[in-house]
Amino acid sequence: MRRAARARIDLNALRHNLRTARRAAPRSRVMAVIKAEAYGHGMLAVARALAAQADAFAISCIDEARVLREAGVTLPLVVLQGFRDAAQLIEVARLGDVQPVIHSTGQLDVLESAALPAPLRVWLKLDTGMHRLGLPPGEAAVLQNRIAALPQVAGVPGLMTHLACADEPERPETGIQLQVFDAATADLPGERSIANSAAVLRTPAACRDWVRPGIMLYGASPLAGETAQSLDLQPVMTVSAPVVAVKRLAAGDAVGYGGGYVCQSPRTMAVVAMGYGDGYPRHAPSGTPVRVHGRRCALMGRVSMDMLCVDVTEVPGVAPGDDVTLWGEGLPVDEIAAAAGTISYELLCSVGGRLRLEYVG
């Protein structure tokens, strides 16, 4: 069931942000990351909007590849988690120009024994320091040669890694990871891909044949301590919901579950049809900003499943039906995430089935 709360998706802002990525990495091709429903923005709509600007799309799983191909999306697809078994691998081959990432010897064993309808392009992922997915860098040459020799594989496997600390450019880990990657792959053929959003913007040495911008495409900052606006990123998602009631409260009145917020003076409160069931962070504290009639107001009390309360004492004329902006245009999602003790990625991805996605541009 859809609620009155909605997320407006500005596709022109999305395209602007991809152009920002291209300017930051002018010698690289762009593998736009659209996994997890394009960080909550709607994978198919985002893929169609970027089809003329991106060079490929990065996705998480084969289910996403299937959805894109069935919808007529034809750009190359790189499956970051690769495949689980032979059945998935066969489906990848049938979908056409879907490129799985190989990050384990188990996947390589499956690839070697699979009878595929067509050879695949693949990527070899090296674990240079994040210690999540990837094979040992010291084995890169042996592994690449082993993969390239297979009849199931078309061409030379690409080489990729993922950066653990690129969002904090002053830390040494990114430089160390690049050194490990370069030492392991110096004499090897194949295209390279390293840079995520943060590295695209602040680590030119990581921008190789392909870059993989993700969060920056959606207008949030990937860098600790830097705003999206300062990075020439425009908000793509603006979440808003209507006021459903306005109440006058007396000094001493407590608001919400637990009564943790107590009015210190008479206040005017607006109840808004948005809650954690819609993807708003439950842990957002009192004082977290929202926008009402273009002015900043503050949350009062705990966020409920379907509602939250806002202090509109200083905003005259607020009435049921008025729109309240929870994040987006004029109110950066990074600011709301920081107030709630989380990251913008989580908020954007949390916008679930109850909200309408409305596309403009």
Swiss-Prot record:
Reported cofactor(s): pyridoxal 5'-phosphate
Transmembrane feature ranges: none
Entry-linked SMART domains: Ala_racemase_C (SM01005)
EC number: 5.1.1.1
Catalysed reactions listed for this entry: L-alanine = D-alanine
Swiss-Prot/TrEMBL keywords: Isomerase, Pyridoxal phosphate
Chain residues that bind substrate: 132, 305
Enzyme class name: isomerase
GO cellular component, one term: cytosol
Classification via InterPro entries: Ala_racemase, Ala_racemase/Decarboxylase_C, Ala_racemase_C, Ala_racemase_N, Ala_racemase_pyridoxalP-BS, PLP-binding_barrel
GO molecular function, one term: alanine racemase activity
Catalytic site positions: 35, 257
Pathway: Amino-acid biosynthesis; D-alanine biosynthesis; D-alanine from L-alanine: step 1/1
CDD domains on file: PLPDE_III_AR_proteobact
Keyword Kinase recorded: no
Protein's GO biological process: D-alanine biosynthetic process
N6-(pyridoxal phosphate)lysine sites (modified residues): 35
Role: Catalyzes the interconversion of L-alanine and D-alanine. May also act on other amino acids.
Family note: Belongs to the alanine racemase family.
NCBIfam families listed in its UniProt record: alr
Entry protein name: Alanine racemase
Organism: Thioalkalivibrio sulfidiphilus (strain HL-EbGR7)
